[in-house]
């Protein structure tokens, strides 16, 4: 399975692509960032992020997308920009019918390092170890995006299978009720 991870941001939107499956070795395919200029108008920045994400989706053809869930920060302007970039990422994936999984920063940190309180350096170090790399992907936003993809492969795909099984079960029950007039 190929997963594209996205660490949303207005100035730097980290992106990483990882191939793998639960119980199998993981391989980093690519890592980088979509960048916009801080002095550009917001609509132009959002369009730039969309074009960049679409290009990554075209180039790497992922099976799923993992996006960092926006959490409340003290700086409202920062969280708004991050939320807008996150929405662009989700829309790009949804437009293609790709499964999207949102992961909190602490969930990703816990999956990668074993601690939800790990710092960026610890996450980067563990990403490099997990993927057998000489050094963490750069910039740090790309390493975070790769960590998101790993988190999806280790956790998100299982959660998705459970959700699909629940939906299938609910449909089966509904069909049985209809057949028996309940």
Curated annotation (Swiss-Prot):
Q: Where in the cell is it found?
A: Cytoplasm
Active-site residues from the entry: 7, 68, 141
Q: What is the uppermost EC class here?
A: hydrolase
Which superkingdom, per the lineage?
A: Bacteria
Q: Which residues cross the membrane?
A: none
- Record-linked Gene3D superfamilies: Ribonuclease H-like superfamily/Ribonuclease H (3.30.420.10)
As to how many cofactors bind and how, the note says: Binds 2 Mg(2+) ion per subunit.
EC number assigned by the record: 3.1.21.10
The protein's UniProt keywords, in alphabetical order, are:
Cytoplasm, DNA damage, DNA recombination, DNA repair, DNA-binding, Endonuclease, Hydrolase, Magnesium, Metal-binding, Nuclease
**Could you say which residues bind Mg(2+) 2 here?**
68
Which InterPro entries does the UniProt record give?
Answer: RNaseH-like_sf, RNaseH_sf, X-over_junc_endoDNase_Mg_BS, X-over_junc_endoDNase_RuvC
- What are the protein's GO molecular function terms? crossover junction DNA endonuclease activity; DNA binding; magnesium ion binding
What family is this? Answer: Belongs to the RuvC family.
Q: What does this protein do?
A: The RuvA-RuvB-RuvC complex processes Holliday junction (HJ) DNA during genetic recombination and DNA repair. Endonuclease that resolves HJ intermediates. Cleaves cruciform DNA by making single-stranded nicks across the HJ at symmetrical positions within the homologous arms, yielding a 5'-phosphate and a 3'-hydroxyl group; requires a central core of homology in the junction. The consensus cleavage sequence is 5'-(A/T)TT(C/G)-3'. Cleavage occurs on the 3'-side of the TT dinucleotide at the point of strand exchange.
Subunit structure comment from the entry? Homodimer which binds Holliday junction (HJ) DNA. The HJ becomes 2-fold symmetrical on binding to RuvC with unstacked arms; it has a different conformation from HJ DNA in complex with RuvA. In the full resolvosome a probable DNA-RuvA(4)-RuvB(12)-RuvC(2) complex forms which resolves the HJ.
Entry protein name: Crossover junction endodeoxyribonuclease RuvC
- Tell me the classification of the organism that encodes this protein: Bacteria, Bacillati, Actinomycetota, Actinomycetes, Streptosporangiales
By which gene is this protein encoded? ruvC
């Amino acid at each position: 399975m190929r997963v594209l991870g996205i660490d949303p941001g207005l100035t730097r939107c980290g992106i990483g692509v990882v191939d793998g499956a639960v119980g199998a070795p993981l391989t980093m395919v690519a890592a980088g960032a979509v960048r916009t200029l801080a002095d550009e108008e917001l609509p132009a920045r959002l369009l730039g992020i969309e074009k960049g994400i679409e290009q990554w989706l075209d180039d790497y053809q992922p099976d799923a997308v993992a996006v960092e869930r926006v959490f409340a920060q003290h700086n409202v302007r920062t969280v708004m920009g991050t939320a807008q970039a996150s929405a662009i990422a989700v829309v790009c994936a949804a437009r293609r019918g790709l499964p999207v999984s949102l992961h909190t920063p602490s969930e990703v940190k816990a999956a990668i390092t074993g601690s939800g309180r790990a710092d960026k350096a610890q996450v980067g170090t563990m990403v490099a170890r997990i993927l057998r790399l000489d050094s963490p992907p750069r910039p740090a936003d790309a390493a975070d995006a790769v960590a998101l993809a790993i988190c999806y492969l280790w956790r998100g795909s299982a959660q998705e299978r459970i959700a699909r099984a629940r939906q299938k079960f609910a449909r089966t029950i509904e069909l049985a009720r209809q057949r028996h007039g309940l």
